Amino acid sequence: MKTRTTSPAIALTTLTRTTLAVLLIAAMGAAAACGDDSPSSPNSPTTLPRAEYSQTDLLVGTGSEATNGRRLSVHYTLWMYDPAGSNGKGQQIQTSVGGTPFSFVLGTGAVIAGWDRGVPGMLIGGRRRLVLPPELAYGAAGNPPIPGNASLVFEIELLGVQ
């Protein structure tokens, strides 16, 4: 009867593969067992509430009209969209009110698509609320601190048209 011998290197390789396989299976099981059973956090991009586009004139101005190709000066306040909040306003993210007005050329892609869509037609002195779905705001990528797939609410006051 012939005795089969295994070299120590082959035995170690077989043992190492078996051990690694067992450890991998154990780790996968532990990870599954320790998973978070709670619902996703409210800030998770997959659970953010989605808004439909809307624009509402809060105050109609009396000055020059905002048209594409013109440089505008505005004050704005930005909130996360929250359907339970007043006028869809959730957490305030940013404002220029009380600071330096924001200036941009309308209709050139210098701002998010929702502004290029929602600001034309405003008159100096006017205030408008824009509710923007993600594709008219910062999309899937977001723009920290704004998470991806966030719907946003802006209130914009038109200060100047050049």
Over which residues does each language-model region extend?
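Cross-family detector of peptidyl-prolyl cis-trans isomerase
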Residues: 2-162
